[in-house]
Amino acid sequence: MLIKGINHICFSVSNLETSIAFYEKVLEGELLVKGRKLAYFRICGTWVALNEETDIPRKEIHQSYTHIAFSIEKEDFERLLQRLKENDVHILQGRKRDVRDCKSIYFTDPDGHKFECHTGTLEERLQYYKEAKPHMTFY
C-alpha cells in the first residue's frame, strides 16, 4: 500500500493565540513551533498544524458531525470533563448511546472544530454492532 498512515492534521483557526492556548491547556499538546500565522503541535504522537485564516466562512462547520476522536481511559473520563469545564470549553450534547458503546465527550475548539474523547475501541464498537444491529453487514 502506498499510504503509510496519517501524516498530519491541519485546522484553519481565526485567532492563533487563542487556539494555541486551547490546544496546550485542553488537549495537552506539545507546542513545537510558532510563526506569525501557524503553529505545530504534537498531540498523542500526531502532528497537528494550526494555520490562522481570518477571512474564511466558519458557520457551516457547526452543521456537520465531522470530528476528530481521541482515545481516553474510562477512569479518566470525569477528570477530562472537569478540565473542559474549568477551561470554559464548549461541550456539545452527545448522541444517545447504549452502555455497550462506551462513553464519549464531544466539544469544540474556539473555531468550532469538533472533538470527541471516547473510552471505547474499534473492536468494542464492532462487537456491540454485531450484537445489536442486525441490519449491518460486516466484512
UniProtKB/Swiss-Prot annotation:
It comes from Bacillus cytotoxicus (strain DSM 22905 / CIP 110041 / 391-98 / NVH 391-98). GO terms for cellular component: cytoplasm. Its EC number is 2.5.1.-. It comes from the Bacteria. Its main location: cytoplasm. It is found in: Cytoplasm. It is an enzyme of class 2 (transferase). The lineage of its organism: Bacteria, Bacillati, Bacillota, Bacilli, Bacillales. Metallothiol transferase which confers resistance to fosfomycin by catalyzing the addition of a thiol cofactor to fosfomycin. L-cysteine is probably the physiological thiol donor. This is Metallothiol transferase FosB.
